[in-house]
C-alpha cells in the first residue's frame, strides 16, 4: 500500500479561545502560581459551585483525575465490579483499575455509540452485585 500524507493536519480537537486566556496565563506566570493552586483556580472553583448550586467544586488536572475521583467517591473498592462501555478512552478503565476493581465491558449500540441497554440488562444478570456503571 502506498499512503499519501494529509496536506493539512487533522486536529482531534482545537483549543477554544475567547479572548482573555493569554492574560490569565501571563498572570499565573507572573505570580508564580503554575501549580494546582492560585487565585485563578480558586475563582473558577467558586464560580462553578455557584453556577451548579453546590457548596464546593474542585478543579482537577485532567479527565482521568476526575474519573478517578468519581470512582473513589462512589466507594469502589478492590474486587468490585464496574460496568464500562466498550467504546471509550482508556481513562475510564484506568480509573477503575486504580482502585483494583474489575471492569466489565458492555457493548455499545451501533447507531448511538451509547451503552446498549439490552447488553446492560444481561450484564446485571451475570453480575448482580455491580457497584457502579461508568457512563461516559
Predicted feature locations:
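A short beta-strand submotif of the Rossmann-like class I SAM-dependent methyltransferase core
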Residues: 59, 84, 132-136
Amino acid at each position: 500500500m502506498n499512503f499519501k500524507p494529509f496536506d493539512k493536519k487533522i486536529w482531534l480537537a482545537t483549543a477554544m479561545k475567547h479572548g482573555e486566556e493569554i492574560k490569565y496565563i501571563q498572570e499565573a506566570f507572573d505570580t508564580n502560581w503554575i501549580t494546582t493552586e492560585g487565585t485563578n483556580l480558586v475563582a473558577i472553583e467558586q464560580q462553578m459551585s455557584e453556577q451548579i448550586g453546590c457548596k464546593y467544586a474542585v478543579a482537577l488536572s485532567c479527565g482521568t483525575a476526575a474519573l478517578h475521583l468519581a470512582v473513589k467517591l462512589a466507594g469502589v473498592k478492590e474486587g468490585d465490579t464496574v460496568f464500562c462501555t466498550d467504546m471509550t478512552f482508556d481513562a475510564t478503565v484506568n480509573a477503575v483499575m486504580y482502585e483494583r476493581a474489575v471492569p466489565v465491558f458492555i457493548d455499545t449500540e451501533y447507531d448511538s455509540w451509547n451503552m446498549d441497554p439490552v447488553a446492560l440488562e444481561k450484564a446485571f444478570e451475570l453480575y448482580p452485585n455491580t457497584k457502579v456503571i461508568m457512563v461516559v
